[in-house]
Swiss-Prot record:
There is a cross-link at residues 153, 235, 572 (Glycyl lysine isopeptide (Lys-Gly) (interchain with G-Cter in ubiquitin)). The keyword RNA-binding does not apply. This is Mitochondrial Rho GTPase 1. It is found in: Mitochondrion outer membrane. Residues 184-219, 304-339 form the EF-hand domain. The gene is RHOT1. One of its GO terms (molecular function) is GTP binding. Residues 616-618 are mitochondrial intermembrane.
Amino acid sequence: MKKDVRILLVGEPRVGKTSLIMSLVSEEFPEEVPPRAEEITIPADVTPERVPTHIVDYSEAEQSDEQLHQEISQANVICIVYAVNNKHSIDKVTSRWIPLINERTDKDSRLPLILVGNKSDLVEYSSMETILPIMNQYTEIETCVECSAKNLKNISELFYYAQKAVLHPTGPLYCPEEKEMKPACIKALTRIFKISDQDNDGTLNDAELNFFQRICFNTPLAPQALEDVKNVVRKHISDGVADSGLTLKGFLFLHTLFIQRGRHETTWTVLRRFGYDDDLDLTPEYLFPLLKIPPDCTTELNHHAYLFLQSTFDKHDLDRDCALSPDELKDLFKVFPYIPWGPDVNNTVCTNERGWITYQGFLSQWTLTTYLDVQRCLEYLGYLGYSILTEQESQASAVTVTRDKKIDLQKKQTQRNVFRCNVIGVKNCGKSGVLQALLGRNLMRQKKIREDHKSYYAINTVYVYGQEKYLLLHDISESEFLTEAEIICDVVCLVYDVSNPKSFEYCARIFKQHFMDSRIPCLIVAAKSDLHEVKQEYSISPTDFCRKHKMPPPQAFTCNTADAPSKDIFVKLTTMAMYPHVTQADLKSSTFWLRASFGATVFAVLGFAMYKALLKQR
C-alpha cells in the first residue's frame, strides 16, 4: 500500500475547486476565495486510512500547461471537478480533461479518476444521468460524487473516495467491461483460499472461515453472520457452498460481490494480509524478511517450523501412506508460482520404494534448503503462508541462527542440529555410493538412478548418543585445489576405492593441502570393500597414514549389500562433527564408538515405534 496519497483537483475555471479544498480544511464555506489554494497536507492520524494526504489545486490563470503536466505526473489520483449547473464544464470532462490526463500517463497504469459534481446546492436535479455514460465509457473513472462546497455536502466523502481510489484501486482487481475479476486477482485469491483450507478438503468450514476472518479483520464472525454469508452465496450460485463449507467458487463470488458493491477495500485487506502489493505480486518484504546471519553461523529450522511443515505434509498426504505422490506434491506446490523441487530432490532425501518423498525426506529437504540457502527457505515458507497460519510476524521466526562455531569449540559443546560433511575423492571412487547409502539405498537401487537426476547432496537423520541430528553430505568434484567454499564444513569424509591403486594418493594430497593443520576432523573411508583390495601407489599405506596423522583407521564401506548399507560411518562422521574437540585417542577407542552406535540403535528403534504410533493416530 502506498505510503502517502497525492490528490490533484482539475477542471474548468470557477467550478469551485479551490472552494472545495478550503471548505474541507476550515469546515465552513469561505467568503473570499483566492485564485488557487496552496498545497495542503492532511496528517495520517486524521485520515480514515491512516495515510498522509496531499491535496493540490490547479488554476489555469496562475499555472502554465507545463506545470499542469508536471502535477498530473506527480498525482496518485485526479478529481475532475465540474459544476452541476454548468453544461459546458460537464462537456469539458470528456472533450478536454480525460484525454489530456490519459496523454500524460502510461496506458498500462492509468491514473484513477474521480468525477466531482460541485454546486449541487444550486439545482434541484442530479447530473448523474449525464455522467453515467461517461463512467461506462472510461474504466479509469472510479466513481462520481455530487457535492456542495457551500453546504459542506459530501466534502469529506469526496476526499475519502479519492484516497480509497489510490489505496484500494479497482483496476488491478476487476474488469468492468467483462463484469468479472481479472486473472491475476483470481490467481491470488485462489492461493489465499488454498492456504486457508487447512484440512485440504476443498471448502472453508466454519472454523477455517473464523480463523480467516480473525487474521484478516481482527474479529471473528458470529455463527449467524457466518450462516448469512453462506446464504448470500447459495442464493446466487448453486455450487458456492458444499457440506456447509464455502467452496473456492463461493469464495471468489463473495469477493466479486464486494468489488461490484464498491467494497473493494475488503478484498484489498485480504490480499495485503497475505503479502500482495498493488500489482498483485507478493512483496519482497513479505517473501524475504530481514534475517541477520553473522559469520561462522549457520541457519536451521526451529521446533515451530517443523510442526508447521509436519502439518503441511499431513494436509497433502491424502492417502495417508506417509509419502507424497507426484500428484500430492503438485497439489502442495499450487500455492507457489513455480515448482521448486526438481527430480534431483528424490535422490537427495529418503523416498519410498516407488520413489516418492517420505515424511522424513520432506523434512530433510526443508532442513537442507534452510542450511544452504536460507533466503530461498524464507521465500518458500512465504508461499505456504507460514507467518499467517502460525500468526508470527514473518518467516524469520521459523529460523534459528546458530552461534559462532568458535564458541562451540571453546565450550566443547554444540547446540547445532545440522552438520555438513564434505565428501572428497577422485571420480568413480564411490562418493555417490556413500551419499546414497545415507538414504538407505544399496547398489541395486543406486543403479536405477538416471544420470540427469543425480544429486551432489544427500541429507538424513542420524542418532548419536540418543540425539537426532541431520547429516548433510556434499559430493565435492575432483580438482587440484579446493576452493574456500569446498573446505568449509564440520567434518570431512575422504573416500578412496580399495580396488584402484591410484585412488588414495588424492585423498592424502588433499588432506595435507587443506586439512592437516585445520581443526576440521577427517575420516578416511575405504570404499567398495566388497572388491579385491590392491596396494595403493603411495609412500605409506592408508592405515599407516591415519596412524601418522592421528586419525581413526580407514573405515571399510560397501553399498553392494542385499539390504540397506551399514550406517556406521554416518554415526562416526556425525559424532566427529558434534565433538571436534575429542582427542584422536578417543576417536580410535572402540568403547567411544560403541556408546555412540548403541544410542543410535536404541533411538532408531524408539523412533520407529513412535512413528508407527503416529501413523495409527493419523
